[in-house]
Amino acid sequence: MFDIGFSELLLFGVIALIVLGPEKLPQAARTAGQWYAKIRRTVSTLQSEIEAELDLAETRQLMQKELAKIRQTEAEMRREMAEMRGSIKEFEHSQSQNLKTSDKAASPANQANNDSAIQNNNEPATFSYAYGQSNNLTDSQQLSNQDITSINSDAVTDSSTIKQPAQPLITKPWENMWFRLGAYDKARRLPAVPYLPNYKADILLNSSFDSSFDSPLNTQASVNQQESE
């Protein structure tokens, strides 16, 4: 920190040894080291605080610049919005003026048409000898048009029926189709299995039946024994 070399330290040590003596030199060196450590700590803290302040100042400057940019863009957007509103108002005003002029131009024409219609209605109607002929002509024209449309529709239906080919059958009958049934379907569809006694497994329970079926003499002996008892 102070740019002190080894020779300077050696010179300071010799001078302190001469001035203080060998007894007070260790204590003086200890106190000097403590003071040196305190000075280093204070210097480091001051340096860190100064750097933090500088960083804060830089960040503040950057924030101020960004805020200035944001405010500038906001002012530009407001100006553009004001211009758009002014143009919209001008367009609406021009449209209203055009509508007013068109209404003013159409009103005298409508009045003239109404006046001519009123005059025509006030005039007496002249009798025309071709009234019945015109009605007959219109009726004959309607009938001819109906005949033509019916002929065309019949032709269209005939052509459509002729052009439609026979569609092949896509579905197949359910022949030779087998399905595997589950437990639920088996329980619902199949009947219950009849119970048959297992003579081989239940030997003790069915021993009398086996002996009776095996020899009729044994059955007779058993009957006689029961009677004697």
From Swiss-Prot:
GO CC annotation terms, alphabetical: TAT protein transport complex
Protein's name according to its UniProt entry: Sec-independent protein translocase protein TatB
Sequence ranges of Polar residues compositional bias: 108-131
Pfam families with a match to the protein in the record: TatA_B_E (PF02416)
NCBIfam families: tatB
Subunit structure: The Tat system comprises two distinct complexes: a TatABC complex, containing multiple copies of TatA, TatB and TatC subunits, and a separate TatA complex, containing only TatA subunits. Substrates initially bind to the TatABC complex, which probably triggers association of the separate TatA complex to form the active translocon.
Lipid bilayer topology: Single-pass membrane protein
Region (Disordered), start-end ranges: 90-131
Recorded family membership: Belongs to the TatB family.
TM stretches of this protein: 1-21
PANTHER family: SEC-INDEPENDENT PROTEIN TRANSLOCASE PROTEIN TATA, CHLOROPLASTIC
Protein task: Part of the twin-arginine translocation (Tat) system that transports large folded proteins containing a characteristic twin-arginine motif in their signal peptide across membranes. Together with TatC, TatB is part of a receptor directly interacting with Tat signal peptides. TatB may form an oligomeric binding site that transiently accommodates folded Tat precursor proteins before their translocation.
GO molecular function list: protein transmembrane transporter activity
Presence of the UniProt keyword Transmembrane helix in the record: yes
Primary location group: membrane
Gene transcribed to yield this protein: tatB
Source organism: Psychrobacter arcticus (strain DSM 17307 / VKM B-2377 / 273-4)
Top-level taxon of the source organism: Bacteria
Protein's GO biological process: protein transport by the Tat complex
Alphabetical UniProt keywords: Cell inner membrane, Cell membrane, Membrane, Protein transport, Translocation, Transmembrane, Transmembrane helix, Transport
InterPro entries reported in the protein's UniProt record: TatA/B/E, TatB
Subcellular location: Cell inner membrane
